[in-house]
Amino acid sequence: MKGKMSHLDKFLENRMLSAPKSVPSIQNIASEFISSPDHLSAYDFRQPFSTILVGQVQSGKTGHYLGIAAAVADKEPRFPIFLLLTQNSVSLQQQTLKESIKLLTTFDVFDESSQVEFELSLSSSSSPKMVVLKKNKTPLRKWLRILNQDLLSGRPLFIIDDEADSTGLNTRVNVPDQSDINEILEELISTTNAYFLQVTATPQAIFLQNKVSVFRPKSHLQFKPGTGYLGGNFFFPESTMPYSYKQTDNNELNLLRNPISNELPIGLKKAIFTFCITAFYKLKIDNDTECNFLIHPSVRQIDHQLILTKIQFF
């Protein structure tokens, strides 16, 4: 791109402000994706093609797939529109939307509700477009109608599926039947001959898809977590008992379910005290803005409400 900064260079400049240590890895993955014969170069634009990007849990997958999108926009102008699919959660979809707007400043980025703005931008701006959607039937069907062949003029979509093993795969394959989300995604991919980039930390179910399925990846990429990453091997080592795992008495849940007593069992008390000390340190010493604690003592919602009341009383 002559005369102005490339999409990838601008993305990396923005990324440098918030996560500078991730930039070399993103650069390497983006370069491999567009230069290797196994990925973008293997796609013929006449039929769907799928690649899977694998990274550890909470290791920076969002930055890596957005970097790939920027590199693709530089390399291949035949992708005018990118779809970014998130889990079926408003908060996650909005978080991903904000991150995309912040980092992809050379793109026009749209919320799933911004159909009018999206359509206006097609004639008013030459920038690549990205639409961020939840994997939910309503927005997916809506954008399946919008992104028809008349609008695309025969050009394919570039679809990024974040947490690709969640929701999008066929959850009714043993019935046998096809789940709604899987059916919509399959139609979206097939009718637009899309390039489908699946992103996950747990690829097992994706690799087990039928060989002729559009969800079965034809190539794969993997990146290592950066310096300082603390993942499953740290918290749950195979050689020793994890320090983060503390076993409690078997009867603690029964005590928590007792409706006539507000007393908390010793295991939960210790967990709460540990959280309070940790939160104080993180907020006052490390200057973090928040610190959260998840308590999931039962699969029954009625238990959750009773136990919440006891904890609040405590």
Feature-to-residue mapping (PLM):
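Pre-Walker A (Motif I) flank of P-loop NTPase domains
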Residues: 46-53, 80-81, 127-129, 289-293
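Walker A/P-loop
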Residues: 47-67
